[in-house]
């Protein structure tokens, strides 16, 4: 946590003061802290939202859903859902100076369950997202060799069906109906040692467990001192992946066949716009890549100074995120185009999404390049960094929420560090089940259900309804104006009121209608209890919102209408817009704490 305290100058402006010792409140709790500067906040948010989905999900969705035509539904969701909810969550954190749970308690107690729902998603996300880092670290360490281990069929884990690819004739070196490539055998038989189903978990993969332990150790020390350590680490973790991406992009576009790959990536097929699945993919991609409905943006925004221009930051970060996804598509599909030409097969046979791209398609392409170990190291180091800052910001979000809920317990010397250690240890131990021989099936359950687009859409519906219709869109706009000095684009307010809840509700209902049970590798079908477990993971977050509302209504005393009124009223200690305007002479904050009778029924 930052050790700054706020001082007030003669003209009323807030000015940071840097004491030598860590400042404490009157009750002995440590101060909450702020970012040292705007750049730390911007890089932290950039590190959170720019992650693996930008590299391995967006390019594939663009290719799959009509190439350049996919940008039409993508931009619709960007402006109607992505940017409005992104601003809503960031501004909410900055305005309340609270984490992902207590921020909602402050503005509308009856919807505090929104915070619990988002943190439940984050808890599950913290367990399984870092598994990808364990795999990437394993591949990274395996790349420090002259000959990449997935480049040939002469290893102990290879089977008699393994066949190396012959570039000269565009076919496998041999013929067999059961032929497999060395890349797939390395992934399934060396890395995963995958079993035949979720019912057979098998033994723990100790090498992957050590990689997971290393990932958690790195994650812990990135955030163990709060924003003081996080703000420094992101200077590297949020910027270095761009250097790696540029290097891979330059290498990719200079390869033969790159133009063919880029054409498949961008060539517009407008007829795909009539397929509702294309629109659903665009919507879920926005929610995944913008990290909304997770409480992370609220937590990061809560460490901003009150008058930080969060509106400008949000617009810039949203376009940076989308731009990164677009550019990453060139880097990925130029390589896939090269691989398609080398193998003499259609690009549809080499294009993959998710882990299939990172651990099968791209490693296969790297083998065909000169100095292949170098390019493998660059790629997997980029994957590690992309996942690392997304991971530790999610952990920071959970810790911030817990500390703000129980400040007298955790805002003491060294207790925050112990809390982070506890979260890391528990998440590490739970995550070990995904590193067993059947762990991949468990990982897929978490990925498909726990942090699915369905869960995020459900939370987004209530977020927009709560702020726009219960707290009041105009009131929240007044709060933002008080913070930044002017009112944001009016369309955003109407998105909160109408477009965002309508679009999210329609997409949520469509995802329910189009639901299909989970399969692995398009071959393995989960048993009924596997899908039931997945639905429990999904409902564990969604049920928090109605359950908390019913709990608070049931425990509060008084007439029903009075209980509703109390639970819909914001906290009295929230700062309100200065009636004289943001440029008016300084007014004591205490005179603005209470809402006027004209502004609220509370």
From Swiss-Prot:
The chain crosses the membrane at residues 41-61, 68-88, 121-141, 207-227, 233-253, 282-302, 319-339, 366-386, 418-438, 453-473, 490-510, 528-548. It is a multi-pass membrane protein. Residues 1-40, 549-602 are cytoplasmic. Expressed in brain, kidney, lung, liver and testis. Mediates sodium- and chloride-dependent transport of gamma-aminobutyric acid (GABA). Mediates transport of beta-alanine. Can also mediate transport of taurine and hypotaurine. Belongs to the sodium:neurotransmitter symporter (SNF) (TC 2.A.22) family. SLC6A13 subfamily. This is Sodium- and chloride-dependent GABA transporter 2. It comes from Homo sapiens (Human). The gene is SLC6A13.
